[in-house]
C-alpha cells in the first residue's frame, strides 16, 4: 500500500511538471484561439496581434489550474479504477479495465477536471479579452441599446470590457463587477465539451488504431495521433466557441443562456463562426500530447519510477 501511494505521488509530481510545461509552451495557440473566438464577425484580425508578451496573458491562471487539475486527475482516476475493477489483485488496475469501464472512468474524471478548471478558464478569458482589445477604438464604437430584450437580441446597455493585466486584479474585478457567478460562467458548455472530448477522442483513437494496425511503427502512431486530434477539434470546436463566448466579460448582456448564445451566433454571424480558432486549437492539441508525454517520461526517470507503472 505504501509503495502504491509513493508511486501515485511520483505520478502526480511528474504529471504536474508536464502539465505546467505543456500549458506554457502551447499557450500562444490558446491565446490566439480564444481571441478569435471572442471577436465578433467583421472585426479586424490585427486587433488580436499585440506585443509578444501579450501572448502569455492569462497563462498564470491556466498553470494554477493545470497543477490542481493534475492532482485531481490522478487521484480521481485511481479511485474510479479501483471502484470499476472487479479483479484487483495487482497494481496494474489501468490496463485491467475493459474498454467500456475505461471510457466511464475517463469521462467521469474529465467532468471532475472540467468543474475544477471552470473558474480559471473564466479568469483566463477575462484577461485575454482585455489584452486583445484596442480600448480606444472600443470606447468610440461602444453601442448603447435600450430597446426591449428578446430571445433574438439581448437589448440592454452594452458592458464595456475592463483593462486588466494580472491574475489577482482580474479575480478582484470579476468578483466586484459580476459577483461569484463570474467564476462559473460557461459551466454547461464546458461540461458538454468535456463529455464530447472524452467520447470522441476514445472512439476516434480506437478506430484509427485499428485502421492502421497492420503498420506497427512510429509513423502509424503519429498519423493516429494527428488524425484523432483533427477529428476531435472538428467535432467539438462549436462547443468550444460557445464556451468561450459564455465566459466573456459581457456574456450576461449579450446572451440569455447557452442555447441563446448558439442561436445568435448561427443567425447573426453564420455557421463558419462555430469553427473560429480551430487551426490554433488543432496546433495546440496536436503538440500537447507529445510534449506532455515526453516531459512526463523524463521527470519519471529523474524520480526513479516507471512511467508505465
From Swiss-Prot:
GO molecular function, one term: citrate secondary active transmembrane transporter activity
Membrane-crossing residue ranges in chain numbering: 12-32, 47-67, 100-120, 184-204, 222-242, 285-305
Membership in a protein family: Belongs to the mitochondrial carrier (TC 2.A.29) family.
One GO BP annotation of this record: mitochondrial citrate transmembrane transport
Keyword Lyase attached: no
Annotated S-S bridges: none
Organism field: Saccharomyces cerevisiae (strain YJM789)
Gene Ontology cellular component annotations, sorted alphabetically: mitochondrial inner membrane
Protein name: Uncharacterized mitochondrial carrier SCY_1795
Cellular localisation: Mitochondrion inner membrane
Solcar repeat residue intervals: 6-83, 97-211, 216-302
Record key words, sorted: Membrane, Mitochondrion, Mitochondrion inner membrane, Repeat, Transmembrane, Transmembrane helix, Transport
Topology of the protein relative to the lipid bilayer: Multi-pass membrane protein
InterPro entries reported in the protein's UniProt record: Mit_carrier, Mitochondrial_sb/sol_carrier, Mt_carrier_dom_sf, TXTP-like
Amino acid at each position: 500500500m505504501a509503495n502504491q501511494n509513493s508511486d501515485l505521488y511520483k505520478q502526480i509530481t511528474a504529471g504536474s511538471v508536464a502539465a505546467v510545461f505543456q500549458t506554457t509552451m502551447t499557450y500562444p495557440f490558446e491565446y490566439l484561439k480564444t481571441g478569435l473566438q471572442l471577436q465578433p464577425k467583421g472585426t479586424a484580425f490585427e486587433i488580436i496581434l499585440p506585443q509578444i508578451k501579450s501572448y502569455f496573458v492569462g497563462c498564470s491562471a491556466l498553470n494554477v489550474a493545470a497543477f490542481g487539475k493534475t492532482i485531481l486527475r490522478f487521484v480521481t482516476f485511481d479511485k474510479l479504477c479501483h471502484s470499476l475493477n472487479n479483479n484487483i489483485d495487482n497494481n496494474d488496475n489501468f490496463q485491467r479495465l475493459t474498454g467500456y469501464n475505461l471510457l466511464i472512468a475517463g469521462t467521469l474524471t474529465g467532468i471532475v477536471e472540467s468543474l475544477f478548471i471552470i473558474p480559471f478558464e473564466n479568469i483566463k478569458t477575462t484577461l485575454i479579452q482585455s489584452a486583445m482589445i484596442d480600448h480606444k477604438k472600443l470606447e468610440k464604437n461602444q453601442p448603447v441599446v435600450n430597446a426591449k430584450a428578446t430571445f433574438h437580441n439581448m437589448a440592454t446597455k452594452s458592458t464595456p470590457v475592463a483593462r486588466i493585466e494580472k491574475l489577482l486584479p482580474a479575480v478582484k474585478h470579476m468578483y466586484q463587477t459580476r459577483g461569484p457567478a463570474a467564476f462559473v460562467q460557461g459551466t454547461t458548455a464546458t461540461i458538454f465539451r468535456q463529455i464530447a472530448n472524452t467520447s470522441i477522442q476514445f472512439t476516434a483513437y480506437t478506430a484509427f488504431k485499428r485502421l492502421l494496425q497492420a503498420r506497427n511503427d512510429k509513423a502509424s502512431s503519429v498519423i493516429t495521433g494527428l488524425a484523432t486530434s483533427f477529428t476531435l477539434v472538428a467535432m467539438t470546436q462549436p462547443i468550444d466557441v460557445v464556451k468561450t463566448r459564455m465566459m466573456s466579460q459581457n456574456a450576461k448582456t449579450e446572451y440569455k443562456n447557452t442555447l441563446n448564445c448558439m442561436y445568435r451566433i448561427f443567425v447573426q454571424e453564420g455557421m463558419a463562426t462555430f469553427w473560429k480558432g480551430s487551426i490554433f486549437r488543432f496546433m495546440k492539441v496536436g503538440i500537447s500530447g507529445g510534449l506532455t508525454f515526453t516531459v512526463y517520461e523524463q521527470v519519471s526517470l529523474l524520480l526513479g519510477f516507471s512511467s508505465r507503472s
